[in-house]
Amino acid sequence: MLRSLIGSLATALAALGALIGPAAAQQQPLRSECLAMASRPPLAVPVSLRRTAAKAEEVAITYVGHSTYYIDTPGGVRIGTDFNGFYRTGRLPDVVTMNRAHSTHYTLSPDPKIPHVLHGWGENGQAAQVSTRVGDVYIRNVPTDIRRYYGEDSSGGMIRDGNSIFIFEVAGLCIGHLGHLHHKLDDTHFAAIGRLDIVMVPIDGTYTMSLDGVSEITRRLRSAVVLPMHRFATPLDEFMRLIGQQFAIDQRSERTLKISRDTLPGTPTVIILDGV
């Protein structure tokens, strides 16, 4: 009798564990590898292993236009940054991120066939909170303030947490898109961003922020690859002068950069893709 009771209890507990286990796993917060890597020194990898792994871990980044880059992951996920529906090439993205500064950085009527639409702003004055995994990429945001335009009210001030920097973690790479950034970043922002191997930076010098300001951010991030965007008529020489001689410059004749964790340049490099 006692054995039978114990056996029944064990069976019931096992069944309960099977039900609770998946739910508990879903509630576990997603972990940022880029924040973890920022807090520890880089590990040396033998050259032979780097060469073997590079092809399998390659990410393709294509300049589409304005502030829109397409990021194609090894797992087949396509991401479109600052997606507005106008700047497109090839198949639709699986994920789109948006900033709400102007209509060229977002759309409220995206193609319904895009399964994941991520806004850089929240509702009712709240900051956006993005922490999601799609296929082989983990996507998160760091809220930033956005300029309030005089057409909206009489203040012309800033909307706290009204926009976002988006960070994409895939194939061992930390890729950041600064969006339509309107202000300098403080220590809290840099801590929340963590390590960025590749960063997409607006260099218009007016609509977002001054070239001095964005150059200071670029220097502090010290990413291996800097991809300019939102250029308009900004002379590239002026941007390069401001960010300093510690950055190399690499001007390409193609729109797509294929890169892996192990093919990042040893010297921080501004890579200017065709069309920028």
Where are each of the predicted segments found?
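Metallo-beta-lactamase
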Residues: 20-148, 173-178, 197-201, 230, ...
